[in-house]
């Protein structure tokens, strides 16, 4: 009886572990820029052509974990050179649904925003975050295991 019980438990745990999917780790390789991109908010500069595009993001706010919908998708490209990291971001949304709120620096408020966190120690625990809202308010943060 005990042997059958252990066999059933083993089979159940095996099925449960197979049923759980491990999320795929997404990575975007930055491309070394041959020339400095023009910083004007218009992403038609030739330097961006052929650079890999990151898509299929997951929301943090207002619904954590919700996958983006095509009509409100975000596309990111990253370049770098000896002096800077350049990020191109295209955020698709109906203009009348973009939430803008003019607040002080380092205060995101309830506005729509985009941010990047660089895992500068490559340890998954420490990093530096840079954010900007739809109204142009900037926010930066340092993340660590100890707060």
Feature annotation, model-predicted:
Residues 2-11:
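Sec-dependent signal peptide recognition
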Residues 14-16:
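N-terminal signal peptide c-region/cleavage motif recognized by signal peptidases
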């Amino acid at each position: 009886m005990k042997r059958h019980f252990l066999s059933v438990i083993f089979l159940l745990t095996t099925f449960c572990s197979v049923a759980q999917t491990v999320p795929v780790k997404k990575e975007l390789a930055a491309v070394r820029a041959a020339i400095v991109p023009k910083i004007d908010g218009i992403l038609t500069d030739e330097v961006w052509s052929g650079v890999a595009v990151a898509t299929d993001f997951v929301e943090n706010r207002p619904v954590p974990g919700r996958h983006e919908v095509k009509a409100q998708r975000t596309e990111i490209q990253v370049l770098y050179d000896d002096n800077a990291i350049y990020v191109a971001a295209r955020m698709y949304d109906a203009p009348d649904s973009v939430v803008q709120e003019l607040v002080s620096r380092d205060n995101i408020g309830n506005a729509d925003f985009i941010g990047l966190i660089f895992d500068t120690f490559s340890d998954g625990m420490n990093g530096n975050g840079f954010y900007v809202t739809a109204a142009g308010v900037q926010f930066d943060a340092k993340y660590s295991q100890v707060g």
